[in-house]
UniProtKB/Swiss-Prot annotation:
<comment type="similarity">
    <text>Belongs to the universal ribosomal protein uS9 family.</text>
</comment>
<dbReference type="GO" id="GO:0006412">
    <property type="term" value="P:translation"/>
</dbReference>
<dbReference type="GO" id="GO:0003723">
    <property type="term" value="F:RNA binding"/>
</dbReference>
<dbReference type="InterPro" id="IPR000754">
    <property type="entry name" value="Ribosomal_uS9"/>
</dbReference>
<keyword id="KW-0687">Ribonucleoprotein</keyword>
<dbReference type="GO" id="GO:0003735">
    <property type="term" value="F:structural constituent of ribosome"/>
</dbReference>
<dbReference type="Pfam" id="PF00380">
    <property type="entry name" value="Ribosomal_S9"/>
</dbReference>
<dbReference type="GO" id="GO:0022627">
    <property type="term" value="C:cytosolic small ribosomal subunit"/>
</dbReference>
<dbReference type="InterPro" id="IPR014721">
    <property type="entry name" value="Ribsml_uS5_D2-typ_fold_subgr"/>
</dbReference>
<dbReference type="InterPro" id="IPR020574">
    <property type="entry name" value="Ribosomal_uS9_CS"/>
</dbReference>
<protein>
    <recommendedName>
        <fullName>Small ribosomal subunit protein uS9</fullName>
    </recommendedName>
</protein>
<dbReference type="InterPro" id="IPR020568">
    <property type="entry name" value="Ribosomal_Su5_D2-typ_SF"/>
</dbReference>
<keyword id="KW-0689">Ribosomal protein</keyword>
<dbReference type="InterPro" id="IPR023035">
    <property type="entry name" value="Ribosomal_uS9_bac/plastid"/>
</dbReference>
Length: 129
């Protein structure tokens, strides 16, 4: 029985994912998917997307530890980690996951604040007179 490890990232969220052949159990931070999400269906679909595309939702067990960021970033980090683990599990899945962009790290992060400005781009109010 192989145990595959993969890491997914999004913004400041990091997901450590362990994938094993099994019967479709999902454990996120030692909770079920529904307990962890609290009933957010859109975020649940985001997490399940790589499993549904590869039709592996009933044939692999996933144990994940997710930290940092908010719920949406954590869900996308988890999706990235699951996709990378499925790719390592069977190379055939690459042809399914790659065109959907699930193996690509989303590199968009918060822009840093610059001096002389109120935020990253917001300037102080300008008065002509």
């Amino acid at each position: 029985m192989r145990k595959i490890y993969a890491t997914g990232k999004r913004k400041t969220a990091i997901a450590k994912v362990w994938l094993t052949p099994g019967k479709g159990e999902l454990s996120i931070n030692e909770q079920s998917l529904n307990q962890w999400l609290g009933g957010h269906e859109a975020i649940k679909m985001k997490v399940m997307q790589p499993l549904l595309l590869t039709k592996q939702e009933q044939s692999v067990d996933i144990k994940a530890v997710v930290f940092g960021g908010g719920y949406s970033a954590q869900a996308e980090a988890l999706r990235h980690g699951i996709s990378k683990a499925l790719n390592a599990y069977d190379i055939v899945f690459r042809a399914i996951l790659k065109p959907k962009g699930l193996l690509t790290r989303d590199s968009r992060v918060v822009e840093r604040k610059k001096y002389g400005k109120r935020k990253a781009r917001r300037s102080p109010q300008f008065s002509k007179r």
